[in-house]
Amino acid sequence: MSDTSAASTPAAPAAPLLTTPLHALHIELGAKMVPFGGYDMPVQYATGILAEHRHTRTAAGLFDVSHMGQVLLTGDDAAAALETLVPVDIVDLGPFKQRYALFTNAQGGILDDLMVTRRADDLFVVVNAACKQQDIAHLQQHIGTRCTVQPLPEQALLALQGPQAVTALARLNPEVQKLVFMTGGHFTLAGIGCFVTRSGYTGEDGFEISVPSGQAEQLARALLAQPEVLPIGLGARDTLRLEAGLCLYGHDIDTTTTPVEGALTWAIQKVRRAGGARAGGYPGADVIGAQLAQGANGVQGGVSRKRVGLISTERMPVREGAQVVDAAGAPIGRVTSGSLGPSINQPVALAYLATSHTAIGTEVFAVVRDKRVAMTVAALPFVPNGYFRG
């Protein structure tokens, strides 16, 4: 039966796009704006995605990531409460240390990925833009009686990334040089009180800076005045994170993928696994625990598919959604992210493949416009990380 309702009923108007505190600055800088996560965001500036990507890999790039959600969890029970929603060690996280985490559902699927930093009196949490309203509701519903869940819509978020990021930021406050990867602290930058973590989404050394919205443009201009720094859009952010082998939520991980399938078991600390002092106790713990146990016993990681990196010596980029087949043409998986890797000048991709084909060096084929593109399962990241660990 065909649906004719669309022809007779006017479509509901799309919700107007939100803007970040740097929107006017993006326009001034000549950005090409696109919708992303409900916001009007810069996808690139005049120099283009390739130049922006390479500049970030060699110097320093400034990204507006204010569309992401920032939340404070406050109260003596906050860490233990958060552990009921994530398979991650939060209780033992040291002061001003940061950790990657995952919200899971009852099936072991991933509701979102997030960053958690323990500060003196709270947990500072950053979640993805497209998920932030549901994440805040999730926190309030499940742990809102155990701790205070405080969204921070009045805070902007900037990311300064690249090997020269520390040089540029240290001109505003030399103390930031004391931070190492996945740590944070309170710093005054250009006269503005900020919370800074040494982390990011590019595979490079860099910083993420939470700043009051009303002073975000002042800080952005101070950073752009540094000779190493250029503004970078979401297009290069995507190619940078892909080369770094980092997942994009809603593409490489989602509610149908478990952390084991997503090759994210490194994010589940021993204390939260079977035999650990605080094993389980989070949504989907039975599913994820069983997959971990089977993997430990050599049963193909306990899953039938797994996320891997793919690299090709051919020139044709392989995009999200491309089917992956074996030498006989039998389907074995699908690409979830793909692009030319500007740093290595070869097509790279993330894909879920049958575990029988996930060994490093396995040759597979991506189907692009009915043509088979030879690809090889490769170790991640595709480009060495530049994180500063001290």
Describe each model-derived feature in a short phrase.
Residues 88-142:
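Well-ordered mid-protein domain cores that form the structural environment of catalytic cofactors
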Residues 74, 104-106, 325, 367:
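A generic structural motif
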Residues 1-101, 109, 234:
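Acidic, proline/glycine-enriched N-terminal capping motif
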Residues 52-56, 106-113, 139, 193-197:
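Membrane-targeting and insertion segments and their boundary/processing signals
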Residues 64, 113, 208:
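Acidic active-site catalytic centers that drive phospho-/nucleotidyl reactions
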Residues 76-110, 164-192:
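Internal amphipathic helical hairpin motif
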Residues 1-35, 41-45, 119-390:
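Conserved, structured C-terminal
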